[in-house]
Amino acid sequence: AAGVGLIVTEGTYVGHDSAGESNRVPRFHGEEQLAGWAKVAADVHAAGGTIVPQLWHIGMTRTPGKGPVPDAPVVGPSGLRPGADEPTGVTMTQRDLDDVIGAFAEAAAAAERIGFDGVEIHGAHGYLVDQFLWSGTNRRSDAYGGDLVARTKFAAEIVAAVRETISPEFPIIFRYSQWKQEAYDARLAETPEELEAILSPLAAAGVDAFHASTRRYWLPEFEDSDLNLAGWTKKLTGKQAITVGSVGLDGDFIKGFMGEGSPLRGIDDLLDRLEREEYDLVAVGRALLQDPEWAAKVLAGRTDELKAYDAEALRSLS
């Protein structure tokens, strides 16, 4: 596996009609799709690697009329797209919530059954689970809206349902972020205390590791501390934490989607923080797409051989 300890797949749609909008994004439900995923897991294991699927529902970011089920409604906690003031979608009912929770649980059970090594729940970047966590998209007045803990209820129920469905030793990773695709300056938590209020129910529900998504891993998350979001996550929960955000590169990843490359950025600080056990794992995206030997080179101390990112590396996947 060229030094890569764990592969997290791209986002994969769970089995809910409103989960996605692109027919080019893989689904993690259905006999044919799961047979294909079983082969992926087997091939990764044959190469000496481990792999988890990232389970995903995009919620209010979906475009009406698109996706595997075009007629399905666009749903969210309050029918609000991230960054919007007026609802354009459907506010989810209790039945809707239960259906989505069940879809995540069924996908996780399938992942274990067909040979994956764990699951990651996508709760970041302004998609459905994150839409419940963020006050900008969650205006509910029932048990799923209001204060920080109430806004975490839906995510915690997904985690609990997944945990109940899979074996106790099968790991659950929960990915979350402050920023959103439509709002880089959005924040779930302004203080460590607020972050703890969000993460504690998730940890109690069964999360084994948190994937703390930032755009630039080296930036401190709160005042008066150098800890980044992953560092605070580990400190507050005691759970394993994954850091991510422009690892090894100086350019923003969103610009990479727009066809821009990125120069290299040194990783001495990254490795120092890892050695101090501020976090436990490092997620690498564009740098690894550019150079599949990235992890092996870093582990061998051959950082002088690392390559700058060229957007052609992303286009090669399509």
Language-model features: locations:
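Flavin-dependent oxidoreductase catalytic cores
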Residues: 1-318
